Amino acid sequence: MDIPKNIKERYEKLKAEIEEHNYRYYVLADPIISDQEYDKLFKELVELEKKYPELKTPDSPTQRIGGIVVEGFNKVNHLIPMLSLDNTYNEEEILDFHKRVLKNLSLNHVEYFCELKIDGVSVALRYTDGVLTQAITRGDGTTGEDITQNVKTIPSIPLRLRENLTIEVRGEIYMPKKEFVRINSEREEKGLPVFANPRNATAGTLKLLDSTEVAKRKLSSFMYYVIFPQNYNLETQEEAINFLKEVGFRINPNYKNAQDIGQVIEFWKEWNRRRKELEYEVDGIVVKVNSFELQRLLGETARSPRWAIAFKFEAEQKETKLKAIKLQVGSTGIITPVAEFDPIQLEGTIVKRASLHNFDYLKERDIREGDYVLIEKAGGIIPQVIGPVKEKRTGEEKIIRPPEKCPVCGGKVGKIKSSEVAIRCLNPSCPEKLLRTLENFVSRNAMNIQGLGPKILKRMVDAGLLKDIADLYYLNEQKIRSLGEGIGDKTVENILTQIEQSKNRELDRLINALGIPNVGSKTAKDLANHFKNLDSLIDAKFDELVEIEGIGEDIANAIIKFFSQEEVKKIVKKLKDAGVNMGKKEEEKLEGPLKGLVICQTGALSKMTRQEFAEYVESKGGTFSENVTKKTNILVVGENPGSKLDKAQSYGITIMSEEEFFDKYGES
């Protein structure tokens, strides 16, 4: 059908506007609109493409949603080889590299460009007339695989450049540390093998055949190299980095133009010390001769360039004695082996326990109780047992085999699916499963029932007071007092008050608290916003669920299966009968001293957490923003403020200390 001219013009304007906001957010870190305003523009674009499918183009921002499933990945030849880098680990070796460079060039001085070495997956991006046409993995260096549809889902990679260039650039795709932790927690809950580190998680994600699934994992990127730089009048790596940023790519801001090898070493020392500050993994720095002409003169070997080297950080590993391997039962029945070892200090924290994930992990690494083992932090966050120090074995070490019965209740164990690695307790009445479910139900992000910690919940389960989560709402003074020692008047009153108050929690908290597999706080909010009440969610059909952004087939099936269980139906009825809120409350525009003001925070506050401060701001009629934009009215500064302070100062935004803010606007 003929598309009206004004619709075509609006469509092109929307595309350009959204890409401009993507550039400001991901490349410049300087957004000028709120998330809500961005979502409104994006939704309008989606609606236009639904109504007029002929409008849709390969560079449309809606390509980031995914939805394309491929049968496999085609092989693609690289224009020039994607070489790997030689590695060096100490100052002596980097000085040897420097001497080789000077000797080969017959020079006394060379300028270097130093970049952080992102621990991710290398990619080549090809653009034709400014539009992304192909994304290729490194592969064997000569031939890679076409992963274009998956790469299109990564928000920091532009689908259209700011100039109509035909160009190939190279860089790194990575998974942020927080996303790595989230995905591994989710996989462990599903009984799937966990990823060893963020790099493996990134590689696994990019090899998924369904781009919708890729879009759910928040990958990001940094570009750092231009193929055939002379075609764009670029003479140095520093010029290339600035050029990449100008045309729309996200570049890593932590780089240095080093005038001598001493400055290279200082840069390496600085980031070896500061790398824990970063939201992504780095495993060293990359040192490049800055001049492209000198790079050309130095050339390459068959495997690596002579003009660049990776100056690696040593991963901090500690050796300790694995005293015991305990078996832990989770809320879904998964039995997880947990290592308990002599306490060690690792990257600034004391650690003495680490998950061993599953029994396949134990077997593959031949980890035994009583071994001396090496520990490091996966993704710089989670303590992980790397493997045993076999030369220290005495023969008294004990092999831990999968249990034949539940270590807590003695019930049957097995696998729900033959494909999963997890072994589960299959007893629906297992007290340990119930205890973990209760702990989730009362937690801060769920029903937020304070005063019911793990110890008192265990006493209640052991005493038979709690058979399911709904039994919490049928506790009374007599039942709580029957627990005996340590339960005084104040404790009883506090527990009953907290339980009563929790009946009025928002619907999304209840959904999160129920323990639906694969449904966390973000998904729970999406479900609450869509269905408005629990009954509508319970009755929802598969097709309706998958229409909700962020709800894939796995989550939809998990929701349907969860609410089809007779046990769950009984629990929901008991919760209703007890007066627990089952519907989303109508949002009221709160009046207060902060009405109409957008408030942002940087640094740690002494009075409350970030989440509590956000809730406080909104309770006073204000809007809490995670980012400083030109629409921010006040930045509240706590201890150790970050870059938001500099940005707020450059925008002329009102800056207040925590004390000044609460003096003016009152405390909760």
UniProtKB/Swiss-Prot annotation:
One GO process term, biological-process aspect: DNA repair
Source superkingdom: Bacteria
Q: Which PROSITE patterns match?
A: BRCT, DNA_LIGASE_N1
Q: Which SUPFAM superfamilies match?
A: BRCT domain, DNA ligase/mRNA capping enzyme, catalytic domain, Nucleic acid-binding proteins, RuvA domain 2-like
Q: Where is the active site?
A: 117 (n6-amp-lysine intermediate)
The record's annotation in CDD domains points to: BRCT_DNA_ligase_like (cd17748), LIGANc (cd00114)
The reply on keyword tRNA processing is: no
Pfam families named in the record = BRCT (PF00533), DNA_ligase_aden (PF01653), DNA_ligase_OB (PF03120), DNA_ligase_ZBD (PF03119), HHH_2 (PF12826), HHH_5 (PF14520), Nlig-Ia (PF22745)
Binding of NAD(+): at which residues? Answer: 35-39, 84-85, 115, 138, 172, 288, 312
Name of this chain's protein:
DNA ligase
The organism named in the record is: Petrotoga mobilis (strain DSM 10674 / SJ95)
Instruction: Give the source lineage, highest ranks first.
Output: Bacteria, Thermotogati, Thermotogota, Thermotogae, Petrotogales
The gene that this protein is the product of is ligA
